[in-house]
């Protein structure tokens, strides 16, 4: 079999297809590179691994530098990934070739599936996906959430909260770090913050005022989750988790439920974000609407 000519013809056809069918070019790229990867895999088994380098030299000369040895090896990796996972090209969650290039170095199957789903559902660019992988997003999920994802069980709002939350300090001096600074850093990159506590969030207000008796209290951050149809109270603490923090946030949650929430919305939830966890405090928290996580400064 003349593997080289077949590979070359697939790549030429793909380039021509992209010029007239721009809408479907990402899918066609993936299928073309998968088929090239399959041929490279078979050629390597027949002639040895060095054949890939030989093919790349010829392809660079005839079709351009984009088909160098490194790229061809990625195509071969793509085929091996599909083969190993026993995916059909039709049923696999097809994201872009660029996104697959970000995922190829990952070895863990559960992690691969997580990032593929993330890219597919959120229409992530390669740059955005790279950022999420680099932040070790999967590793920051709870073991309970990972098990749910593996067994395809439904996840709830708590399952999507990462631990720890990474807060960008923008290289500012944090010698005298306090809750006000923590809130400021979060607000400066609110989109990244909301991504780390799940999806479907909309920002309402910081320092949200509520009147308790004759005195105003202020909620650090008030969000709304469109997917779960509920308000979300966020309280920020720069210390270890304490029992009084739970009492405080429950008071705010109850206020929202009584005075703001409509009848067709779910009960308000609360998330305490603190410097250090204390599992013993949460053991005696009877309210399953209260969650906690920690933060680290980047």
Provide a role label for each language-model segment.
Residues 1-298:
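Basic, low-complexity intrinsically disordered segments
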């Amino acid at each position: 079999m003349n593997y080289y000519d077949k590979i070359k013809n697939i790549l030429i056809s793909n380039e021509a297809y992209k010029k007239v069918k721009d809408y479907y070019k990402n899918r066609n790229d993936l299928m073309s590179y998968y088929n090239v990867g399959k041929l490279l895999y078979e050629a390597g088994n027949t002639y040895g691994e060095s054949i890939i380098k030989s093919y790349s030299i010829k392809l660079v000369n005839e079709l351009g530098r984009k088909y160098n040895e490194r790229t061809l090896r990625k195509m071969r990796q793509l085929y091996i990934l599909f083969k190993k996972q026993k995916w059909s090209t039709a049923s696999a969650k097809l994201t872009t070739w660029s996104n697959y290039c970000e995922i190829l170095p990952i070895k863990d199957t559960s992690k691969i599936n997580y990032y593929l789903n993330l890219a597919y559902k959120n229409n992530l660019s390669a740059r955005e996906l790279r950022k999420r992988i680099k932040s070790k997003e999967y590793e920051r999920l709870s073991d309970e959430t990972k098990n749910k994802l593996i067994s395809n069980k439904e996840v709830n709002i708590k399952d999507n909260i990462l631990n720890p939350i990474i807060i960008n300090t923008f290289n500012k001096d944090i010698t005298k770090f306090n809750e006000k600074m923590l809130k400021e850093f979060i607000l400066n990159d609110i989109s990244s913050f909301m991504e780390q506590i799940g999806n479907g969030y909309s920002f309402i207000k910081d320092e949200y005022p509520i009147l308790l008796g004759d005195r105003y209290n202020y909620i650090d951050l008030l969000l709304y989750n469109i997917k779960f149809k509920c308000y979300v109270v966020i309280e920020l603490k720069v210390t270890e988790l304490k029992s009084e923090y739970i009492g405080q946030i429950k008071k705010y949650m109850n206020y929202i439920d009584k005075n703001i929430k409509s009848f067709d919305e779910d009960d308000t939830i609360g998330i305490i974000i603190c410097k250090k966890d204390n599992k013993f405090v949460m053991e005696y928290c009877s309210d399953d609407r209260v969650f906690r996580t920690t933060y680290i400064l980047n």
